[in-house]
UniProtKB/Swiss-Prot annotation:
The lineage of its organism: Eukaryota, Metazoa, Ecdysozoa, Arthropoda, Hexapoda. This is Nuclear cap-binding protein subunit 2. The keyword Endoplasmic reticulum does not apply. The gene is Cbp20. SMART domains: RRM (SM00360). It comes from Drosophila mojavensis (Fruit fly). MRNA binds at Y10, Y33, R102, V103, D104, W105, D106, R113, Q114, Y115, G116, R117, Q123, V124. The keyword Membrane does not apply. Pfam families: RRM_1.
Length: 154
């Protein structure tokens, strides 16, 4: 494998199975995790970009688990491993909606994984962010709650 398609060190802590089963699933998978998306990026934009590398079987958009709105990630599944490898090689680190996107191997989509795992419903990384990122909802969610103006007029 070339460096661009090697497995990263990230492992899904909610994976049902042993570490070696997860490694095997990642090495055989044709599913990719796509991160650092704008909350405004559409499924159509993702399909247009990723279909340049092969036939996309399905795209599952990541959603805020409470609001059911996009929260900056998705899963892209191809029909073959070779197509997914091409996407890892050519799409990882490219720009989509003025954002550098991250592409990583995924062991395969399981129902429920489309929802953010953060306390506020979105992604954990967006809860603690201290910078302002308009494409990902402004300031981090937990920071925004702490600095929200007093609206009860006291």
């Amino acid at each position: 494998m070339s460096a661009s398609i090697d497995l990263s060190s990230y492992r899904d802590q909610h994976f049902k199975g042993s570490r070696s089963e997860q490694e095997r699933s990642l090495r055989d998978s044709s599913t990719l995790y796509v991160g650092n998306l704008s909350f405004y990026t559409t499924e159509e934009q993702i399909h247009e970009l990723f279909s340049r590398c092969g036939d996309v079987r399905i795209i599952v958009m990541g959603l805020d688990k409470y609001k059911k709105t996009p929260c900056g990630f998705c899963f892209v599944e191809y029909y073959t491993r070779a197509e997914a490898e091409a996407a890892m090689r050519f799409v990882n680190g490219t720009r989509l909606d003025d954002r550098l996107i991250r592409v990583d191997w995924d062991a395969g989509f399981v129902e429920g994984r489309q929802y953010g795992r953060g306390k506020t419903g979105g992604q954990v990384r967006d809860e603690y962010r201290t910078d302002y990122d308009a494409g990902r909802g402004g300031y981090g969610k937990l920071l925004s709650q702490k600095i929200a103006p007093n609206t009860d007029n006291r």
